Amino acid sequence: MSDYKTTLNLPETGFPMRGDLAKREPDMLKRWYEQDLYGIIRNAKKGKKTFILHDGPPYANGSIHIGHSVNKILKDIIVKSKGLSGYDSPYVPGWDCHGLPIELKVEQLIGKPGEKVSAAEFRAECRKYAAEQVAGQKADFIRLGVLGDWDRPYLTMDFKTEANIIRALGRIIENGHLHKGAKPVHWCADCGSALAEAEVEYYDKTSPSIDVTFNASDVAAVLAKFGVSRVDGPISLVIWTTTPWTLPANRAISLNAEFDYQLVQIDGQALILAADLVESVMKRVGVTQWIVLGDCKGADLELLRFKHPFLGFDVPAILGDHVTLDAGTGAVHTAGGHGPDDYVISQKYNLEIANPVGPNGCYLSGTYPELDGKFVFKANDLIVEILREKSMLLHVEKLQHSYPCCWRHKSPIIFRATPQWFVSMDQKGLRKQSLSEIKDVQWIPDWGQARIEAMVANRPDWCISRQRTWGVPMSLFVHKETEELHPRTAELIEAVAKRVEADGIQAWWDLDPADVLGADADNYVKVPDTLDVWFDSGSTHASVVDVRPEFGGHEADMYLEGSDQHRGWFMSSLMISTAIKGKAPYRQVLTHGFTVDGQGRKMSKSIGNTVSPQDVMNKLGADILRLWIGSTDYSGEIAVSDEILKRSADAYRRIRNTARFLLANLNGFDPQKDSVKPEDMVVLDRWAVGCAKAAQDEILEAYESYDFHRVVQRLMQFCSIEMGSFYLDIIKDRQYTAKGDSVARRSCQTALYHISEALVRWMAPIMSFTADELWNYLPGERAQYVFTEEWYDGLFALDASETMNDAFWADVLKVRSEVNKVIEQARNDKRIGGSLEASVTLYADANLADKLNQLRQELHFALLTSKARVERYENAPDSAQATELTGLKIALSEAEGHKCPRCWHYETDIGSNADHPEVCGRCATNVGGNGEERKFV
C-alpha cells in the first residue's frame, strides 16, 4: 500500500474557516424570524422561574449610535444567559415617543402648532414621525442579534400605555403626593417650558461677577449689633452674584447664623462681610487698607433691614444653612422665584416669591423702566450700569463658570417661578420611603447606591408638568376660582383614561368637559399641561410591566442603562413606583459607562471619532461588535476604535478556529453510539473535560455576576492555552493515526464532543450568530436552537485523589514547556527541523521522575517528540540543559530511525511488518491490526 493518507482520520467539516459574518448573519436573522425564534424560546421556557429585564425606552428620534449598541447588547447577553441558566426571561423592547425633540423635528417639517397647523394635526404628525423613527431603530437593533418581542414592543404613545400613564398619575394623586405651586423650576426660554433635571446639561459660560452693596436702613441698629459707636459713610451688607439679572426679584439677604461677621471700614463706607472672607473680598475689589471695627454672629443680624440697591424698598437679613464660605462674601442675595435654596428659605420667612420674568425669558412690564421687555441675559450689563449709577456696585469682573443649559438647545436656562404641578418629596414621606427602598436594591457597580441616595436626599420636588403639545395630558380639572382639583378627580381620571385607551391622547383635547362633568362643567377648566416625558418612561413599571401577560404580574428584576440614568430613568421610576406602590420597581440596577474613542475622548461628530454600529456590522459583523462589548469592563468608560475592533476580530478568529477544530475532529462521531464512558477514557481526555468543567464553573459565575469581560477572558484562556497550546496539539497524533473506531480515538472524540457542547453554550449569549452556526454542525440529536437550552451538564472532572489528577497534569505541562524551549533552541541552531525529529532525555529528581514514569511509553506523545526517556537527575551530563524547573535538566538528540510517512514519527522499526513495510510498527497495527492501546496520552 503506497497511499496511507486514506488510512488517516483526517479532520473534515463544512463549518467554514472564515466567519464571513457580514454576509451570513442577515441570512441567519431571516431564518430566526421566519421560524419565530423568540416564540420558540418562550414556549421552551414556559413555566420556568422568571427573570424580567425591563427595557428602558430609547428615544424615538434618529439612528442608533454605538452607545445604543452597548446598551442593547448588554441586555441581550443577560437575557440569553438567564435563559441558559433555566429562567424564562421575556424581553419586551420599548420606545419613548413623546416630548420636545420630536416636536422640534415636526415643527421643522410642518410648522408650529396653532400657526400653520392645528394642534390635533401636529400631534398626528408627531405620532407618525415617532412611528417612522421606531421602525428604523428597530431594524438596527434586530441586526445586532438582539432577541425580543419586536413585533409587539411597547411604545409610550400606544393608546393603552398613554391611558395607563394617566392612571399612574391618578394613583399618585390618590396617595396625596401631588401639589401645585409657584416654584422655581429649570426653564428654557427657547422651549418655553420647564425642564426636568435630566434635561439639564452643564457648559462653560462667561458671566458678570459682581459685588453689590445693600445699605442699612437702620444704621443705629447695625452699629449696636457690632458694638460700634460710629463709622465713616454708609453701612452696607455686601452680596456677590454671577446672575445680576435676578436682582429685580431680590426680597432678602441670607446669612449663616454660625458664621462670624465683621464690620470693616474702608475709604468712605463700612462693609459687613464674613470674617473668613474679608481678605479675599478686599483682594478682589482692590482695597489694600481697611480697619475691622467690630464683630458679631450672623444670628445677631437676623431681620435687620437693608435697602434694595435700585428698587426703593427694604429687604430683611435672614438665616440659612445654604450660605457657605466657599466663595463670595458670606451674604447671599435671595430671590425666591429664581432658585430652589432661595425658595425654601423664602417660604420659611413667608417672603414674596417674586417672578418678574415671562416665559420667553424677558422681564415683565412694570419690573423696572430700563429693564421692561428685555431678555434677562442681555439685561446683565444694563443692571451693572444701573448699580454703577446708584453707587451700589462695589466691583465687577468677568467669570467663566459651569452653567446649566438646555440639553436640546444648548442655550443657558434660568430658574423661574411658574405655576406647575409637582410630585412632593416630603408632604407624604416620599423621600424617606424612597431612601429606604434604595437599600433593598442591588446596585451594580455598588457605588451607584451612594450616588442615587445623594440625589434623592437632595433633590427638590419633581415638577411633572410641561407646557407642550406632544405629550400625555395631565387630564385634570381645576376650579375656575379656587384652582382646586375636582373632588371626583379619581373617577374623572379613569373616565379620561378609558377614552384615551380607545382613541389616544387626542381624546383629551377633544373632550367637552360637560361630557364628564355635566352641570359642573361651567365651574371647572381643563388643565392644559402635559406630563414630563420622564413621567412617561418612569411609569412603565405600571403601564407596561404590570399589564403585559408574559411578565405574569411579576415586578422587574433588573433595570440596565447608562450611568446618567441615576438621575433620569432610575430616579423617575423609583419616585413613581414608591409613590404608587410603596416599593422600588426593580431588584437590581446595573449601569454601564459611555463610549469613548481609543484615546479616551468623548465621541463627537465634530472631532470625527464616532464609530457607527451599522458600519461595523456591514464590515465585520454583529458578532464582532458583540464580542467587543462582551470583552469590555463596561462599568467605566468603554473605548472603541478600529484598532480595538480589530483586536476583537482577532480574538473571534481564535475562538472560531478552536470551534472548527473540534467540529472537524468530530467527523463521523455519533454521541449515541460512539461515546466512551468516563472510566474507560484516556486520562488526558478526562483531564481536558475537567478543564472545560473548571472553565464552565468560572464562566457561569461570571455570567451570574454580569462580569462578561471575565467570561471572554476565560473563554480565550480555555481556547488558546488549555486547548490550543496543549491538548488539541497533543491529540492530533492519536486522533488522526489511531484506528477509526478504536477506544483511543473515540475517547478523544468523546472529550471533544463534551467540550463542544459546553463551548457552544458559553458563546451563545455573546457570539449569538456563531453559536447558532456551530450548533447546527454539532453531531447528535438536538433542539432546533441553542437558545432554548441550558448550560451543559455532561462535564466531569478528574478526582483529586487520583494519581494523575489536575496537579499531575499541571506538572506535565511545565515539563513540556521546558522541553519546548530546548527544541526551539535546537531548531534555531539547525540541529533539527520539527519537534518529531527530536529524542529527549529528561534528567529528573526522584519526585518528578516518579510522575513522568507513570506515563510509561506514552510520555513522548505528551512532549510531541519521537522518543522520550527519564533518567536520574544526578546522572545528567554537562551537556544537559538546565531549566527553570528545580530538579529537571534536558538533553536533546536527533531521533534514531526514519520518518514514518503516515505518523511522521521517527522510528527504527519501519519495514518490520511485511504487510505494511513502508510504515512503523505502531501504524501497521493501526492500519492492519487491532489498533494501538492508549491509557494516558
UniProtKB/Swiss-Prot annotation:
User: What residue ranges are annotated as transmembrane?
Assistant: none
Q: Which residues bind ATP?
A: K605
UniProt motif ('HIGH' region) ranges: 58-68
Q: Keyword check for ATP-binding, yes or no.
A: yes
A GO cellular component annotation here is: cytosol
Question: Where, by residue number, is the motif 'KMSKS' region?
Answer: 602-606
Q: Which domain of life is it from?
A: Bacteria
Q: Where does L-isoleucyl-5'-AMP bind?
A: E561
Q: Which biological process, per GO, is one annotated for this protein?
A: isoleucyl-tRNA aminoacylation
The protein's UniProt keywords, in alphabetical order, are: Aminoacyl-tRNA synthetase, ATP-binding, Cytoplasm, Ligase, Metal-binding, Nucleotide-binding, Protein biosynthesis, Zinc
Q: Where does Zn(2+) bind?
A: C900, C903, C920, C923
Q: Tell me what reaction this enzyme catalyses.
A: tRNA(Ile) + L-isoleucine + ATP = L-isoleucyl-tRNA(Ile) + AMP + diphosphate
Tell me the cofactors it needs: Zn(2+)
Cofactor stoichiometry and binding?
Binds 1 zinc ion per subunit.
InterPro entries reported in the protein's UniProt record: aa-tRNA-synth_I_CS (IPR001412), aa-tRNA-synth_Ia (IPR002300), Anticodon_Ile_BEm (IPR033708), Ile-tRNA-ligase (IPR002301), Ile-tRNA-ligase_type1 (IPR023585), Ile-tRNA_ligase (IPR050081), M/V/L/I-tRNA-synth_anticd-bd (IPR013155), Rossmann-like_a/b/a_fold (IPR014729)
The similarity comment for this entry is: Belongs to the class-I aminoacyl-tRNA synthetase family. IleS type 1 subfamily.
Q: How does it assemble?
A: Monomer.
Q: What is known of its domains?
A: IleRS has two distinct active sites: one for aminoacylation and one for editing. The misactivated valine is translocated from the active site to the editing site, which sterically excludes the correctly activated isoleucine. The single editing site contains two valyl binding pockets, one specific for each substrate (Val-AMP or Val-tRNA(Ile)).
Q: What does this protein do?
A: Catalyzes the attachment of isoleucine to tRNA(Ile). As IleRS can inadvertently accommodate and process structurally similar amino acids such as valine, to avoid such errors it has two additional distinct tRNA(Ile)-dependent editing activities. One activity is designated as 'pretransfer' editing and involves the hydrolysis of activated Val-AMP. The other activity is designated 'posttransfer' editing and involves deacylation of mischarged Val-tRNA(Ile).
Q: List the protein's name.
A: Isoleucine--tRNA ligase
